[in-house]
């Protein structure tokens, strides 16, 4: 049978492209085919890169029949001498004229056309490259643009590598300098860290996704709250603003006040010994520790989960409590404060222009890099932001209601033992009637 080879020569003195027709047989090995090509073109087998159906042929022991080559097929042959240009007779004849040129400008270590053909023939490789370098994938159909982008990427890596080597050489000038050796160790460590990061993004990219917390919609005293389920918390916690909104702030036992110590410290106002909480269709008694400094309204801790033998089923994305399955809230229903905290977290630069969150490990695309930088600058002074965010649930309903009722009416209800917000809620429920509002407060 007869096959045709489309030869692309990347050597400076070779033809750009030529066609070669060869008489072969199915039992011919790739090694024999390379020898036949060398006899016809003088190209050494090590410089021959054969492609069949877009796939680079690596195994010289395989036959043409095993590769599926049939009569009339066309194979691509890309010529690039990995050993340099001094082995072929043509290069040897031109050595006096071109000896200075290869020395001044050595050939690149990787041929863009070979890389481009490999990516075109491997859908998996194309998908992986699309996640890290979408600009290269977009230029696959344009060889010149791909070669330009690929060369720019190699030049950038080469400059960074040369700069690191230069720093190491400067530091090695005095091998007995302890500080210089410590800096060399740090440079090498950073290289290993970036290599580990690159391997993780390539082989285990799912670890860089954003993990959403587990929230349930519950009710306390008729007030709906989005509670965070945290099996690592010892007690069930509620913010003072949420306790005000639920109308149980008056039940806080301040003898249980103190300081909570863990990752940080928080002020414990007191404890509500018993209040009714609705989880799904269940009405359950629950105790709450009222604590400041939390950016969540309520946190269901281990005391509540163990008391009712609750089970967190991540496969079903549900909380199973006393045989009842209660679904967790979806990402769109999670409180805005939590998502804003993720957006405000500081980032570190990642490969290919991406940024990675320091706490969540989430990878952000290069297009979001400009938006992440402003969020990182105010971070050192943004520590009180969670308290300000947590204060909004109580301040939002209070602001529009204050002008609606006379101040003396609110003060009368507060004198009965109700909180200011509970007094406003009672006035809203009774249309501003102080007597009816007082009776509602007494019913509490």
From Swiss-Prot:
Low complexity bias: start-end ranges: 85-103, 368-404
Chief location category: cytoplasm
PROSITE patterns: UBA, UBIQUITIN_2
Annotated compartments: Cytoplasm
Domain of life: Eukaryota
The enzyme's E.C. designation: 3.4.23.-
InterPro entries, per database record: Aspartic_peptidase_AS, DDI1_N, Peptidase_A2_cat, Peptidase_aspartic_DDI1-type, Peptidase_aspartic_dom_sf, UBA, UBA-like_sf, Ubiquitin-like_dom
Membrane recorded as keyword: no
Domain UBA as annotated: residue spans: 404-444
One Pfam family, short name: UBA
Alphabetically ordered keywords of this record: Aspartyl protease, Cytoplasm, Hydrolase, Protease, Protein transport, Transport
Residues annotated as catalytic: 230
Residues in Ubiquitin-like domain copies: 1-84
Single GO MF annotation: aspartic-type endopeptidase activity
Name of the top EC class for this enzyme: hydrolase
Region (Disordered) residue spans: 85-110, 339-404
Subunit text: Binds ubiquitin and polyubiquitinated proteins.
Its biological purpose: Probable aspartic protease. May be involved in the regulation of exocytosis. Acts as a linker between the 19S proteasome and polyubiquitinated proteins via UBA domain interactions with ubiquitin for their subsequent degradation. Required for S-phase checkpoint control.
Protein name: DNA damage-inducible protein 1
